[in-house]
Amino acid sequence: ISSSKPNLTVSNESHDISKLSPTKTSTVSIDAELVAQVGGSQIALYDKSGDAFYDLISAFHKSVRGSDPDAALYWYARILQGGGDALYVGRRLLAIASEDIGNADPRAMQLAVNAWDTFHRVGPSEGERAIAQATVYMALAPKSNAVYQAFNKAKIVAEQTSTLDVPDHLKNATSDITQALGHGDTYRYAHDETNAFAGGENYFPQALAQAKGYDTNFYKPTERGLEKQLKDKLQYLNQLNRESNDQRY
């Protein structure tokens, strides 16, 4: 910084400003270390839109995913220290709840929503702590990305088979014409079936259900948390489908 007014000259060897001459035009070299010494505090390594911001968020997310509540709280505090928005962290927790925890502990999603709501109701001081509470819970919750992976697979297959028509038994008969076409005629109402499950029914387009090369078993539950029970339930339903004498196709 150049100036025609009396100025400070700072060298790498000394930051003693009392020895600087006030009579000469000088160049001041200011770095984070100097400002920290003069101001008596450190400068947080953070900016709200650059790499440092995304690195901190990444460290936070990976700490929660890695089940380390202490590290997650540390990076959360670093984000706040640098002037970051606690609600951004709250949004990230909502993403973590579905991406990294999923059905292993569905309560994680509700806790993230509750933390978000608490922040808006009571303000930053108490709200930041609510987000910290959700952070700790999610870090220690059982982990599963089975839903995340299943949805990605479903989107790929849906894109590749987007021209397939909805099967007639799944269509809604909304007019005399659609009724005449037989829409919904052979639909099996699950509540009227044993255990409210229509064994052997198929809810995919016939061409997709019978096509080779497509794995439509998108959701593969883990053995962790509540998802273990969902896995057992899914295996039971699949068995009923295989053993049914009333196969759709």
Each language-model region and where it sits:
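Terminal-proximal interaction/regulatory segments of ATP-powered molecular machines
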Residues: G66-H191, N195-F197, Q210-A211, N217-Y249
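Conserved C-terminal helix/linker of AAA+ ATPases
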Residues: S2-Q42, L87-L93, A150-K155, V166-H169
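Conserved C-terminal "switch" segment of AAA+ ATPases
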Residues: S2-V10, P22-V28, L45-G50, D100-R107, ...
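Accessory helical-bundle/CTD segments and flexible terminal tails appended to RecA-like ATPase motors
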Residues: A198-G200, F204
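Short linear motifs in intrinsically disordered/low-complexity regions
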Residues: L8, E13-I17, A32, Y203, ...
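Extended, compositionally biased low-complexity polar/Lys-Gly-rich tracts
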Residues: T23-Y46, Y214-L230
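Conserved helicase/translocase motor-coupling segment
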Residues: E33-A36, G40-R78, R91
